[in-house]
Regions:
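Gly/Pro/Ser/Thr-rich low-complexity, intrinsically disordered segments predominantly at protein N-termini
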Residues: 1-190
Length: 190
């Protein structure tokens, strides 16, 4: 290998309120696994339906000053899908939290998604196996539920009452007949 050859890497970035923001270093295995698991769940469910699941890497254009790259999105209005990305608010957006994007995902992006009319927004925390589900209410994305996949050792220490309160699956607000299992979202992590 020639040491004089420079390694060129694609730099992932977003445009937030007109400001170019470099995204975290390349996503971790767990980050990608979670995004893939969520995408696969929706992609399988939506086969043959009007809405489509769109994986990480697709640009999302919401305003003249905002170009984002969410980890996964659902778009039901196919007119919003163009050759270079999605133009307009998706119906569901998913962000898997990373140290470098955490603040923007919870702050500016959540506010922007509210203003643009995103119906549902998920924030997923890989380290704690937690999913926050936000729903649009009166023009604001409000926390609806927080779901947590408990490890076996914690479940073993719970009494019957605590175990009865543990949620292992939930529904997306867009689809009454789709039951999403937390163990599927957080499957095969290291």
């Amino acid at each position: 290998m020639n040491d004089n050859l420079a390694r060129v890497e694609y730099q992932r970035n977003e445009l937030l309120n007109g400001r170019l923001v470099m995204m975290s270093p390349r996503p971790t295995y767990n980050h990608n696994r979670i995004a893939s698991n969520i995408f696969r769940t929706f992609d399988n469910y939506l086969a043959g339906k009007n809405c489509t699941a769109i994986a990480d890497g697709t640009d999302l254009y919401l305003t003249e000053k905002d170009r984002l790259v969410p980890d996964m999105m659902i778009v039901c209005d196919r007119n919003k899908i163009k050759y270079n990305g999605v133009h307009g608010a998706p119906d569901l957006l998913v962000e898997v939290l990373s140290p470098g994007t955490y603040k923007n995902d919870r702050g500016y992006k959540k506010d922007l998604y509210s203003k643009c009319g995103v119906h549902e927004y998920w924030l997923v925390e890989p380290a704690s196996c937690t999913l926050e589900q936000y729903l649009l209410e009166n023009g604001q994305l409000e926390i609806a539920e927080i779901y947590h996949l408990y490890p076996d050792y914690m479940l073993a220490d719970m009494d019957e009452k605590e175990l009865a309160e543990v949620v292992t699956e939930f529904k997306c607000s867009l689809y009454d007949d789709l039951l999403i299992k937390l163990e599927d979202i957080f499957a095969n992590l290291i």
